[in-house]
Each structure stands twice: as C-alpha cells, then as structure tokens.
A protein has these predicted regions:
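A short, internal acetyl-CoA/4′-phosphopantetheine-binding micro-motif in the GNAT/acyltransferase core
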Residues: 66-76
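Conserved acetyl-CoA pyrophosphate-binding loop and the N-cap/start of the following alpha-helix
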Residues: 75, 79-87
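Conserved active-site alpha-helix within GNAT-family acetyltransferase domains
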Residues: 82, 97, 102-124
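Acetyl-CoA-dependent GNAT
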Residues: 2-61, 67-68
Length: 147
C-alpha cells in the first residue's frame, strides 16, 4: 500500500516514510489515534486506496482527516476515486478534513462531494538541527508568567 500510494499520488506524493506513518497511525489502538484504510480492487489487483486518520478532536478540528486517496488511472474504472471518498465519508464518524494543493484537479471532485474551502493552510517548519537541540523537558515547560 505504501508503494501504491507513493507511485499513484504522483507529484502530490509524500515520501514513503511519511506514508507508512500515516498507515501506522490509522491502525493504532492508542487513545486518540486510529482510522482506517479503504482498498479498491479490480479482481485481485489493487487499483485505488484511501487512508483516514482520526484526529481525536472535534468541533474546531474535524474528527477525521482524509490523508490520502489515490487511484491507478490506467487500471481503475472511472469514478473509483470518487467512490473511495464517498465510502470514506460514510465510514467516518464526524466531520472530515483534507488538504489539497491549489492546482490539483481533485479540488473539483471534493467540491462536488460537499467539501468547502475553509482555510488556507500555512506551515512553519522548525529547522531539524533546532529540533535535535531542544530537550523534551524544555519543550514541556509552561510559558513565562504561567509558572
């Protein structure tokens, strides 16, 4: 499944390690984690899949996150991606969020299925060398004035 997603997500793909972590999270039994994997097959051949992670939250952040949906466009019947998303929505308890690149044609599909554009996501990534320098106990300290 990791390799299938890595190949068929095309230019929108994550690295294999990130895909594997999303799958591990989906299958986790730890509190506040979990999710599920949907597979679309044509005979014995995998032609599509979707990964949902549960967020453990609700309200301000949807309870579920559609992490990945991909199809093998050469082998999957037309509509396989839409069917996977519909099934993911039906199987999820609570609301579902996803991220999609601005130039991804799948935005139209998601809009047709009832998703609306709520936010523009912005990310700040801590430099790797800085992550390694900060001890865990320092990261857990309360902000100044709350001690």
């Amino acid at each position: 499944v990791v390799e299938f997603l890595h190949v068929h997500l095309g230019r929108f793909r994550d690295d294999r390690a990130s895909i594997a972590r999303a799958l591990e999270y989906a299958f986790s039994t730890e509190a506040g984690r979990g999710g599920f994997l949907l597979l679309a097959r044509r005979g014995e051949e995998l032609v599509g899949c979707a990964v949902i992670n549960r967020t453990g939250m609700g309200g301000y952040i949807p309870e579920n996150y559609l992490v990945y949906v991909a199809t093998d466009s050469a082998r999957a019947p037309l509509g396989t991606g839409a069917a996977l998303v519909r099934r993911a929505l039906a199987e999820s308890e609570g609301d579902v969020a996803l991220h999609v690149e601005p130039d991804n044609a799948a935005r139209r599909l998601y809009a047709r299925l009832g998703f609306d554009e709520k936010y523009v996501e912005m990310r700040w990534k801590r430099p790797q060398e800085e992550r390694l320098k900060r001890p865990q106990e320092e990261r857990l300290k309360r902000p100044r004035g709350e001690e």
